[in-house]
């Protein structure tokens, strides 16, 4: 994808993440848990999404995302019949396995991104290493709120270094409009049964991740056990909003574990506070310049994070 398309998709992703978070906070019918959960574009689907888009095109990927989201959302509506099959230890194991499965993707990004002309160059290794070191130092030595932002700190350090090394190009900013609404159906959905089944399988993993995050949030930040209704509603939001995400050319959304840790450490579980962050994401998504700047982040920086 060229930078202009990537910028549009990033804008759409920010808007969808904000909408998903608001739905999770303030439910629509049975969709949404009414818990302080932040939603964002899921890393769980990354490897599969790259494979499907590379083999069949973005249209096939988006078609699978839409159908898979409807399947997960429907499962959430009937969660009381199957939720006990996923005890906390299973959910925790799945979340851990997701992290390990992303290691090859991170390694490729660290070196500059698979297929990049400068893949494995010294510049990429230096930027990636400095970014990683900044993340680790912040995680080890920082305290409280700053420690929870270790990934953001590393990203900023790596981005500034890449800027001074001449690895960032802002030339595309000049032709952008000031405000642009999210673009519906940037890719025409196509439906491939193999791709759909593969994506549905990963949606089940994503549902387990959401259940784990919901349980962890209730136990650590709210000091109580989660209700079956809450976990099912969280999965509904995960699935149905992911289908909407597909309509805007984005991959599925899911709950973000980082917010669970932040809520546990800070004690901030006020839904209005989380909603303000969601609204900021939506506002950021309608300004093309923000989306474009995010596309300029070098792959090595992302890999280091």
Question: Which positions does each model-derived feature cover?
Answer:
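Generic transmembrane alpha-helix signature in multi-pass membrane proteins
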Residues: 1-3, 46-54, 80, 104-111, ...
């Amino acid at each position: 994808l060229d930078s202009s398309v990537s910028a549009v998709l990033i804008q759409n992703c920010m808007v969808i993440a904000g909408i998903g978070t608001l739905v999770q906070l303030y439910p629509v019918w049975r969709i949404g848990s009414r818990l302080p959960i932040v939603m964002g574009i899921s890393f769980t689907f990354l490897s599969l999404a790259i494979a499907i888009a590379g083999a069949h095109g973005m249209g096939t990927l988006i078609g699978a995302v839409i159908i898979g989201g409807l399947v997960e959302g429907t499962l959430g509506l009937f969660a009381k019949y199957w939720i006990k099959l996923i005890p906390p230890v299973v959910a925790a194991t799945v979340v851990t396995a997701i992290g390990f499965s992303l290691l090859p993707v991170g390694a490729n990004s660290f070196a500059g991104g698979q297929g990049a002309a400068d893949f494995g160059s010294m510049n990429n290794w230096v930027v990636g290493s400095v970014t990683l070191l900044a993340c680790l130092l912040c995680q080890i030595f920082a305290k409280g709120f700053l420690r929870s932002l270790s990934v953001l700190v590393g990203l900023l350090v790596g981005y500034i270094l890449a800027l001074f090394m001449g690895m960032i190009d802002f030339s595309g900013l000049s032709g952008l409009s000031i405000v642009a609404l999210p673009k519906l159906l940037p890719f025409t959905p196509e439906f491939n049964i193999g791709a759909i089944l593969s994506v549905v399988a990963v949606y089940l993993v994503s549902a387990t991740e959401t259940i784990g995050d919901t349980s962890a949030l209730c136990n650590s930040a709210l000091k109580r056990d989660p209700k079956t209704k809450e976990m099912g509603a969280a999965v509904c939001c995960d699935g149905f909003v992911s289908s909407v995400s597909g309509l805007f050319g984005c991959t599925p959304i899911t709950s973000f574990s980082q917010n669970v840790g932040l809520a546990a450490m800070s004690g901030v579980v006020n839904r209005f506070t989380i909603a303000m962050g969601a609204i900021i994401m939506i506002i950021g998504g309608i300004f093309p310049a923000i989306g474009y700047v995010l596309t300029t982040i070098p792959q090595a920086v992302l890999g280091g994070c």
